Amino acid sequence: FVPGALLKNEQTGKSPDITELVGSNHRIDDEKFYQLYERRLMPSLIHASQSSEKSGGALITIPGMGCGAFAGNFQGQLERKIDWVVEKILINHHDKLKGIKGVIFDPNQNPGDCPDSQRKIGNIDYIVKSGEFGTKNSQLKNPAEYGEQFKDTKLFSIVAWDHVSWPGNDFYIGSRETDDGVKAAATDICQTMTVHSGQYDA
């Protein structure tokens, strides 16, 4: 569960992320954007790598974190930036992520200028697959469905986390409107958080 940049605040127009990332010219500072996502993503990437390095390795799916409702005035502009950020993280840190075999970035329902691509970074296959968001099991498929090279890997999926919710977000009240809610519906996260089992009837 990793929050993307919060670039929208309908109450005051400000947030810590806006203050950190957006300059007086109303543009995002690319290096600060990278640093924010690096410090938020790296703990999860390191965990996935270390916990799977001695088995078949990890395949990680990443959604368009912060590209939707929280993008504010930057909606439609962040997909390419996050592609660049993920690629740069893998270039800078692939030697610390030896258990990761593949990373698949799904730029959300608005892929913008972020075309499909595939590249090798160290031992990691980095794949951008646009337009998967909202399709069946788009980020939670059996690893082999993403490619034969991943058939023995363990799937990890980064969840674009709402900044002010428990992991699972609105699925506690039956809504699946967010990446957080959809993945809660597909897993046992609500039960894990609360120790209470529910019933999926949507």
Outline where the language-model segments fall.
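Macrodomain-like recognition of ADP-ribose-binding/processing modules
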Residues: 1-202
